[in-house]
Amino acid sequence: MPPKRPDADRFAYADAARLLRETLDALLPPTRISVAEHAARHRWVRASSGAHLERYDHTTAPYLRGPMEALTEHGIETVAIVGPAASGKTAGPAESWLLQTVHADPADVLWFMHTSDAVEAYVKSRIEPMLEAHAKLIGDLRYGRDSVAMKRFRGGRVEFLPFTASSLINKHVQRIIADEYDAYDPALGDPIQLLNPRRQAAGADSRLLAISHPDLGVPITMPPERQRGIMRLYANSDRRTWWWPCPHCGAFSSPNPGTARRMLLDYPEDAPLDAVEQEARLLCPVNGCVIEDGHRHAMNVAGRWVCAGESIDEDGHVTGAPVFSRTAGFW
């Protein structure tokens, strides 16, 4: 009885044609394309209404383009994104970076979340559907059988892990995603001090993306050493803030605390919560214009990030030089 042919799905190099193709591909340099550009060209996402897929559109959440660009920006080793829940900071930059890594710039990746349950839920609900939706793009790059915790691709692998002491042992990669950074067990110590050695061997080619709601932060006016969690990373970064124009007078201001011209919410303080939600408005700090929520999308499309060390005038002109930091911080 002749021996059975090896299962190509289990043994990546059982197929001679595949072996030859991948050997030749390995000699080619990685495609130089930013995460933002890759998402615009190649990524598909589920439509907000209906079950069909549509092209990733940067105008949906324009403020996420900056963090995506920073992931391939020369001289940047860490990207810290501070923001509220459900603002797209994981679905946008993190997932797009994963897809760009697999398709265009292979490397080993560690993706940490705060618990095993969170890892399993996220991989099953977000990562696996994303990979399946891009089968035509990356199908030939996937290797055999994988699991919730491990996805193998040509030129690299992605491990999805809870942030625990055992998960950090003997892990050395080029890229790390630290999701829900402020939810990590504080008994383990400062997360960045535990994560940096995991990418030390990659040197300046390493990248770490940290994402979180600022649950551990103290007021931004406090010195960096007093900050904790994601806000400590931000305080030691180039501290980029988001600026957008008033839809009525055109003057640029920022919703971020501590900025020179801060746009605030105006609402009836003693009213019931339902009334507050209905009546809350933004106030332009330059001319006092009342801004309805319906203008926010157009304001974001026209918005931009401004680094510490730079100044932006009311007309949107930026002057000055950004402070030097190998961490790009977005808040």
Regions found by a protein language model. Give the residues of each.
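Phosphate/NTP-binding elements of NTP-utilizing enzymes
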Residues: 2-331
